[in-house]
Amino acid sequence: MTKRKLTQNQKRRIHSNNVKALDRHHRRAKKEIDWQEEMLGDTQDGVVVTRYSMHADVENSQGEIFRCNLRRTLANVVVGDHVVWRRGHEKLQGISGVIEAIKPRENEIARPDYYDGLKVMASNIDRIIIVSSVLPALSLNIIDRYLVICENANIPAVILLNKVDLLTDEQWREAEEQLEIYRKIGYETLMISAISGKNMEKLTALLADGTSIFVGQSGVGKSSLINYILPEVNAQTGEISETSGLGQHTTTSSRLYHLPQGGNLIDSPGIREFGLWHLEPAQITNGYREFQYFLGTCKFRDCKHIDDPGCALREAVELGKIHPVRFDNYHRLISSREENKSQRHFMEQDIR
């Protein structure tokens, strides 16, 4: 009997289930350390540079990294968190100490999860770098989805188009025209290639200031960018799936890196879909910065900005003040939000 060939999705599910089973076994075999007062030193400040399921790596003021347990009373600890922690007088089961408290966050980036609600990914970020590429095909709808998140989190965004070495001259001009839509409304854009090195010096100069985070679908080349910027990290890269056109997930844990030219970079696991169903329609509307001048000037206060008479946004599109692609994407995001919210409702019913 011929052995059935597994699809890439099936292989990923099997791998994921195996990892979860091993993690459950690890939890049972390795009891949580009960840190007593006499076992710990004084409190000190630190920054979370990596988060795992049960532990977090904390960097102290001298740049040393210690693996720590988390107090049960803490909310979700994420990469970028400034924390108060205590080092143990001795290392126990490979653990050096415990995180006692999380300092107030300046900001955070979160994504909705069907089972866990809103999941914070990272905190204390100075800019979000939205990584897109020409393979898979450039999607302005996905870029707009990320921008809505950035605007609602009040974190500046930069749009990065990777793999431009694959473009013909005509495709380059088309990509420039698409990115010009965003430049006209105040977003910074970069066209780069981690393979040829084109414009990579502009990216490294941008990253030298503050803490940045890469977000983007799998397969857009985030790991390749990190390998170029930090070759000693050797982040695992993945191939594009021939069947779906999507990349294979390669990064498993969010991590903060210090860059040699200054600044920090957070690499987060690839996200295929950045859902918006946790946002209200008004929040999605407010996520379009060029809409702000026209909001509140529609004929009717409850205008849905679809085919309502006297819609100021639609009039602005007709006058060339709002790009029609952005307006179409806005409607698609509103529509997909309702669909995803309905799917979540049915999933919650199944769970109950």
From Swiss-Prot:
<feature type="binding site">
    <location>
        <begin position="216"/>
        <end position="224"/>
    </location>
    <ligand>
        <name>GTP</name>
    </ligand>
</feature>
<feature type="domain" description="CP-type G">
    <location>
        <begin position="106"/>
        <end position="274"/>
    </location>
</feature>
<dbReference type="GO" id="GO:0019843">
    <property type="term" value="F:rRNA binding"/>
</dbReference>
<dbReference type="GO" id="GO:0003924">
    <property type="term" value="F:GTPase activity"/>
</dbReference>
<feature type="binding site">
    <location>
        <position position="303"/>
    </location>
    <ligand>
        <name>Zn(2+)</name>
    </ligand>
</feature>
<feature type="binding site">
    <location>
        <position position="311"/>
    </location>
    <ligand>
        <name>Zn(2+)</name>
    </ligand>
</feature>
<keyword id="KW-0694">RNA-binding</keyword>
<keyword id="KW-0479">Metal-binding</keyword>
<keyword id="KW-0547">Nucleotide-binding</keyword>
<feature type="binding site">
    <location>
        <position position="298"/>
    </location>
    <ligand>
        <name>Zn(2+)</name>
    </ligand>
</feature>
<dbReference type="GO" id="GO:0042274">
    <property type="term" value="P:ribosomal small subunit biogenesis"/>
</dbReference>
<dbReference type="GO" id="GO:0005525">
    <property type="term" value="F:GTP binding"/>
</dbReference>
<keyword id="KW-0378">Hydrolase</keyword>
<comment type="similarity">
    <text>Belongs to the TRAFAC class YlqF/YawG GTPase family. RsgA subfamily.</text>
</comment>
<dbReference type="GO" id="GO:0005737">
    <property type="term" value="C:cytoplasm"/>
</dbReference>
<dbReference type="InterPro" id="IPR004881">
    <property type="entry name" value="Ribosome_biogen_GTPase_RsgA"/>
</dbReference>
<feature type="region of interest" description="Disordered">
    <location>
        <begin position="1"/>
        <end position="26"/>
    </location>
</feature>
<dbReference type="Pfam" id="PF03193">
    <property type="entry name" value="RsgA_GTPase"/>
</dbReference>
<comment type="subunit">
    <text>Monomer. Associates with 30S ribosomal subunit, binds 16S rRNA.</text>
</comment>
<comment type="function">
    <text>One of several proteins that assist in the late maturation steps of the functional core of the 30S ribosomal subunit. Helps release RbfA from mature subunits. May play a role in the assembly of ribosomal proteins into the subunit. Circularly permuted GTPase that catalyzes slow GTP hydrolysis, GTPase activity is stimulated by the 30S ribosomal subunit.</text>
</comment>
<keyword id="KW-0963">Cytoplasm</keyword>
<dbReference type="GO" id="GO:0046872">
    <property type="term" value="F:metal ion binding"/>
</dbReference>
<keyword id="KW-0699">rRNA-binding</keyword>
<dbReference type="InterPro" id="IPR010914">
    <property type="entry name" value="RsgA_GTPase_dom"/>
</dbReference>
<keyword id="KW-0862">Zinc</keyword>
<dbReference type="InterPro" id="IPR027417">
    <property type="entry name" value="P-loop_NTPase"/>
</dbReference>
<dbReference type="InterPro" id="IPR012340">
    <property type="entry name" value="NA-bd_OB-fold"/>
</dbReference>
<protein>
    <recommendedName>
        <fullName>Small ribosomal subunit biogenesis GTPase RsgA</fullName>
        <ecNumber>3.6.1.-</ecNumber>
    </recommendedName>
</protein>
<feature type="binding site">
    <location>
        <begin position="162"/>
        <end position="165"/>
    </location>
    <ligand>
        <name>GTP</name>
    </ligand>
</feature>
<feature type="binding site">
    <location>
        <position position="305"/>
    </location>
    <ligand>
        <name>Zn(2+)</name>
    </ligand>
</feature>
<keyword id="KW-0690">Ribosome biogenesis</keyword>
<dbReference type="InterPro" id="IPR030378">
    <property type="entry name" value="G_CP_dom"/>
</dbReference>
<keyword id="KW-0342">GTP-binding</keyword>
<feature type="compositionally biased region" description="Basic residues">
    <location>
        <begin position="1"/>
        <end position="15"/>
    </location>
</feature>
